[in-house]
């Protein structure tokens, strides 16, 4: 476990390791959480004993994205810190040389959806939900999440999710390619995730990492270039004049 207790690993055998997101109660994203996640993924990616990673949450919500009550009060430094966390955290996952299976047992919303999009195989519970709500809370996309969304979602799905901010259920998510398999219950979710991880773990590891980089290398390079050009610290901050009111509307339920 990390010092903060946010990340916990469990050996599932045959080199497969479960990485549990444990920032209770809904895996709300913070700068520290995301940077610890990036460091842990980098560590696992370089560990020769790890053949595949299963990413999951012990909570009813997989990840709810930002804590809006907290985020609406962010000053410039805090805005830059969370942008850096989003960029670095999801870049680490997207570029991880090891196979990653996301076992999505609940809602994955806004920034929380990028744990799913940056994984290699995605299993969704029959009651899971998926959305990119940034437009509804008055925030655009940092360079890392933006490039991952553009690379993993077709243009029609980008329109459906990113321009409306509305969530979709598991069947629509499978139709749109966000998830590959739907599990009817939590037991099946674990069974399917482990099954898919075992399949991936049996592949030649160097070749898997090489092919993954062939597919994702250009996107990774664009994210790194964007970060180098100041993408972790946007001038004037991440938020705009509409953000606080939009977040307050969402918190009150008027943004539903």
What are these regions (language model features)?
Residues 90-102:
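Conserved catalytic cysteine-centered active-site region
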Residues 89, 109-162, 192, 196:
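CoA-thioester-processing core
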Residues 56, 103-104:
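Structural motif
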Residues 121, 160, 164-166, 172, ...:
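Well-ordered beta-strand positions
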Residues 35-36, 49, 56-89, 136, ...:
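Glycine- (often His-adjacent) and acidic-residue-rich active-site loop
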Residues 123-128, 179-228, 253-256:
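C-terminal long alpha-helix characteristic of the crotonase
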Residues 1-58, 91:
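Conserved CoA-thioester-binding segment of acyl-CoA-metabolizing enzymes
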């Amino acid at each position: 476990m990390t010092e903060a207790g946010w990340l916990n690993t469990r050996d599932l055998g045959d080199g497969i390791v479960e990485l549990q997101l444990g920032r209770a109660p809904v895996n709300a994203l913070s700068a520290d959480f995301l940077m610890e996640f990036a460091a842990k993924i980098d560590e696992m990616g370089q560990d020769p004993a790890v053949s595949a990673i299963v990413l999951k949450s012990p909570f009813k919500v997989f990840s709810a994205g930002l804590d809006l009550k907290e985020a609406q009060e962010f000053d410039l430094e805090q805005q830059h810190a969370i942008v850096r966390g989003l960029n670095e955290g999801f870049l680490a996952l997207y570029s991880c040389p090891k196979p990653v299976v996301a076992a999505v047992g609940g809602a994955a919303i806004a920034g929380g959806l990028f744990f799913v999009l940056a994984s290699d195989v995605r299993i969704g519970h029959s009651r899971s939900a998926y959305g990119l709500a940034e437009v509804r809370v008055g925030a655009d996309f940092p360079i890392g999440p933006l490039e991952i969304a553009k690379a993993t979602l077709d243009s029609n799905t980008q329109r459906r999710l990113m321009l409306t901010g509305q969530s979709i259920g598991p069947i629509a998510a499978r139709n749109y390619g966000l998830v590959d398999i739907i599990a009817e219950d939590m037991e099946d979710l674990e069974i399917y995730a482990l099954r898919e991880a075992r399949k991936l773990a049996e592949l030649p590891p160097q070749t898997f990492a090489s092919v993954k980089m062939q597919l994702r290398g250009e996107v990774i390079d664009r994210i790194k270039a964007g970060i180098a050009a100041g993408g972790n610290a946007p001038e004037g901050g991440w938020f705009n004049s509409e953000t606080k009111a939009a977040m307050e509307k969402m918190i009150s339920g008027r943004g539903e």
